[in-house]
Amino acid sequence: MKAVVLGSGVVGLMSAWYLQKAGYQVTVVDRQARSAEETSFANAGQISYGYSSPWAAPGIPQKALRWLMEEHAPLKIKPSLDPQLLKWATQMLANCQLSRYQVNKARMLAIANHSRECLSQLRQEHDIEYQGRQQGTLQVFRTQKQLIAIEKDIALLEQSGTRYQRMSVDECIKQEPGLAAVSHKLTGGLYLPDDETGDCYLFCQQMTELAQQQGVTFLFNTNVKKVNTQGNQVVSVSTDAGELQADVYVVAMGSYSTALLAKLGITIPVYPVKGYSLTVPITDESQAPVSTVMDETYKVALTRFDDRIRVAGTAELAGFDPAIPEKRKATISMVVNDLFPHSGDFAKAEFWTGFRPMTPDGTPLIGKTPLKNLYTNTGHGTLGWTMACGSGHLLSQIITGEQSENPAGLDLFRYAS
């Protein structure tokens, strides 16, 4: 049995990995020269199982209106009459109801927890080095209102069996000593001990080598020209490297999956939500984060690698615009300077932007399509690194028949109505 996977970001890569483990002869196609050269390249570095939450949440519509007027707001919207964006935004607003939020978060937590198990097993079986740490995530709050608002999430964490700890300011400092100088800015925190961190790009390079050793073929610098169909199935994929034929095909091209599937008459509600990051070399380890610190006010994550800090945040609805405006640089720079002002050499900060493939409900699209041998694994938003291993394993189970056809409503058919 043969499989073709389109896309070698972390999600496509793990789709290929688990398909080869299931016995498939796998070929991966990517337009870049290496795996993870696009959205997986410089993400936040969080593997945030407990923080797997949809952006569509109660109160977000009101917050979004306020954020439009703030200089360092976590959400920015570039005015547009793009019908895809308007439809996506309408669907997202519909998912801000509490009942929908609870369903969506429960789905996301289920995938994330499964992914934790898969990544743990992967580390046990293979010697992979990606500057990973298993030291949890600390979400810090700056207002009493934020402390109260987090209770609804804590209830869902309890339902899913996710471990957590409410923390006073003193406990936050004990967990992250680098915050001591700014303790007066904090009101408390929420600590999730089972969360992890790691450089997604390094992980992908390691996994590419492992996959190649297991017989997976990678066609880099190769563009997908056309997906060819006959009846209700795919018969081949036309690429720069020629025609590829397989028994099953997987679209894992992140935000670019939408346009490819549209050519086949398949509509998916995945929109590119632009995110930004900066990477700072550490100059004083005692002043740097130990693991990941989440700033609830600005929705920015600060993650420790070995000798670097990765700072990532901001959601911008601007289509596929690759520009990095100075205002976005200022926002993420402000947060790291505010919380860890003496941690790194900010003059050497490297900025990056990527397009997160976001669905309106936050839950990825994993599973079947109207074409019987075509599958999707996309739409993970900010959680591609968190969910990649679990999503890849789950997809392989769906394809091989080990798993139900539509576990927890994860495939695109939940949008059929």
From Swiss-Prot:
Catalysed reaction equations from the record: a D-alpha-amino acid + A + H2O = a 2-oxocarboxylate + AH2 + NH4(+)
GO molecular function: D-amino-acid dehydrogenase activity
GO BP terms: D-alanine catabolic process
Domain of life: Bacteria
Disulfide bonds, paired cysteine numbers: none
Chain residues that bind FAD: 3-17
Classification via Gene3D superfamilies: D-Amino Acid Oxidase, subunit A, domain 2, FAD/NAD(P)-binding domain
Required cofactor names: FAD
Record keywords: FAD, Flavoprotein, Oxidoreductase
Xref: InterPro entries: DadA (IPR023080), FAD-dep_OxRdtase (IPR006076), FAD/NAD-bd_sf (IPR036188)
Family affiliation: Belongs to the DadA oxidoreductase family.
Record PANTHER family: D-AMINO ACID DEHYDROGENASE (PTHR13847:SF280), SARCOSINE DEHYDROGENASE-RELATED (PTHR13847)
Function: Oxidative deamination of D-amino acids.
Protein name (database record): D-amino acid dehydrogenase
Organism: Vibrio vulnificus (strain CMCP6)
This protein's encoding gene: dadA
